């Protein structure tokens, strides 16, 4: 039996905060792997600004050097909204001997009461919550918490900085920054 942490998100772009969360949860919970699952269309956000191909390429570059980090693009292959329930149902059907843990930030802990089919989802997985500045970890739902170093970082902040040609060194993996530059993503590198 393998124990797998799931880290979902738009990863637009994937940054060091994502990698920090994944590694800290993997170590604290002694998980075998962390699977990065980029969403197609998240139900709680507007569409992503970057294509699925670019996002998967950037994730792969970000996680390449870590043997316990894997990319799973199952949600990108699905049409429409990406609901966690559908993803976990598919994963448990495909990998019945695995135990799955779904990693969420404080922003999503607060949002749990509004999740699609939350009661059924709670029977299928264990949620692992990590702190995120500005959000509470208080919930009536069963969530295991992992204390991680917190940094005020989001993909939204990084996209804005890239568009404004502001300094982002040490916030993105170098390989992802090179990819952004080469493909002129987020307005970076355009005149």
Curated annotation (Swiss-Prot):
Question: Which SUPFAM superfamilies does the entry link to?
Answer: Nucleotidylyl transferase
Q: Give any single GO term for biological process.
A: NAD biosynthetic process
Catalytic reactions on record: nicotinate beta-D-ribonucleotide + ATP + H(+) = deamido-NAD(+) + diphosphate
- Gene3D superfamilies this protein is in? HUPs
The EC category is transferase
The source's superkingdom equals Bacteria
> Is the keyword Disulfide bond in the record?
no
Name its pathway: Cofactor biosynthesis; NAD(+) biosynthesis; deamido-NAD(+) from nicotinate D-ribonucleotide: step 1/1
| Assigned keywords, A-Z | ATP-binding, NAD, Nucleotide-binding, Nucleotidyltransferase, Pyridine nucleotide biosynthesis, Transferase
GO terms assigned for molecular function: ATP binding; nicotinate-nucleotide adenylyltransferase activity
Say if the entry is tagged with keyword Nucleotidyltransferase. yes
Looking up Pfam families in the UniProt record yields:
CTP_transf_like
EC number, UniProt record: 2.7.7.18
What InterPro entries does the annotation carry? Cyt_trans-like (IPR004821), NadD/NMNAT (IPR005248), Rossmann-like_a/b/a_fold (IPR014729)
Q: Which PANTHER family match?
A: NICOTINATE-NUCLEOTIDE ADENYLYLTRANSFERASE-RELATED (PTHR39321), PHOSPHOPANTETHEINE ADENYLYLTRANSFERASE (PTHR39321:SF3)
Q: What does this protein do?
A: Catalyzes the reversible adenylation of nicotinate mononucleotide (NaMN) to nicotinic acid adenine dinucleotide (NaAD).
Instruction: Indicate the family of this protein.
Output: Belongs to the NadD family.
Name recorded for this polypeptide: Probable nicotinate-nucleotide adenylyltransferase
Q: Native species of this protein?
A: Oceanobacillus iheyensis (strain DSM 14371 / CIP 107618 / JCM 11309 / KCTC 3954 / HTE831)
């Amino acid at each position: 039996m393998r124990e797998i942490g799931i880290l979902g998100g738009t990863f637009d772009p994937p940054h060091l905060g994502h990698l920090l969360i994944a590694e800290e949860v993997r170590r604290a919970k002694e998980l075998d792997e962390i699977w990065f699952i980029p969403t197609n269309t998240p139900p709680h956000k507007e569409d992503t600004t970057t294509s699925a191909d670019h996002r998967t390429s950037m994730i792969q570059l970000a996680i390449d050097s870590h043997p316990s980090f894997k990319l799973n693009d199952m949600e990108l292959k699905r049409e429409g909204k990406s609901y966690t329930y559908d993803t976990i149902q598919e994963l448990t059907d495909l990998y019945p001997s695995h135990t799955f843990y779904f990693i969420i930030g404080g922003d999503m802990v607060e949002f749990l009461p509004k999740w699609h089919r939350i009661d059924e989802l709670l029977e299928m997985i264990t949620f692992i919550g990590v702190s995120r500045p500005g959000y509470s970890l208080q919930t009536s739902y069963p969530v295991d918490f992992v204390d991680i170093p917190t940094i005020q970082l989001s993909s939204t902040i990084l996209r804005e900085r890239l568009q404004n040609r502001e300094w982002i060194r040490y916030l993105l993996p170098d390989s992802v920054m090179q990819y952004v530059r080469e493909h002129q993503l987020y307005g970076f590198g355009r005149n």
